[in-house]
């Protein structure tokens, strides 16, 4: 029989001396009441994760819920641009206030704290993770039904901080239709499982483009493997979003709240089910 190392986190056995895993979750600001927190993650960049975060917040807002977006992608923030927000966040002695979009979606991003939104954020990992904690603890979010946390790609400091610090109720994994993506998605899924974070499902972005003449679906990035990946991990495919030039136009113009289409309705339904 092997000797006990007293490291219960890496031990798969049950015994009388076993201790519960440490809980590192931090409370939100005392003036905040946030019902559900949904992380939007990806194994790599450039898959449309921020777009998905923004669109989901818009959809839930349209359904009558008070929604918010915490932009945890500190070194590559794009949420304010999608919503056309350029003003700086303000605060008082109680804390910092998020900036509201045209339709009332609350947003907090490092870009809203900079004098010039084009200035780079050149910080090391611990400082970046600390900024994410501050967005959670020091921002006065008030009453929020659904908060979407737009995370940077990969499985580094920020996802780890979010999973440990925030009471994440579920995550959406965003991917593109390439065989290589299956390995990258697997990393994100396995990290969530290691951290005991529920996975709502997979959103495939840039799945196809519809021919404007005949309506035929053309797989620009090759055959999709999302169904195979989802089956491997016993997860639902929440959406297969097409390449839609209108979405790109809305994003570039800072008018993501004007998007049309039912691409993400399945993902929105999964989020809404968290309240039931």
Label for each model-derived stretch:
Residues 1-22, 189-276:
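C-terminal lobe/tail of nucleotide-utilizing enzymes
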Residues 29-35:
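Phosphate-binding P-loop
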Residues 34, 45, 71, 79, ...:
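Residue-level signature of catalytic and energy-coupling elements of molecular machines
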Residues 36-74, 189:
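Walker A/P-loop phosphate-binding motif and the immediately C-terminal alpha-helix
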Residues 66-67, 72-117, 129:
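Phosphate-binding loop that captures ATP/GTP phosphates
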Residues 108, 132, 151, 164, ...:
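Glycine-rich phosphate-binding loops of nucleotide-dependent enzymes
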Residues 114-162:
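Phosphate-binding/switch loop-helix module in NTP-utilizing enzymes
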Residues 139-140, 159-180:
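Inter-motif core of Ras-like GTPase G domains
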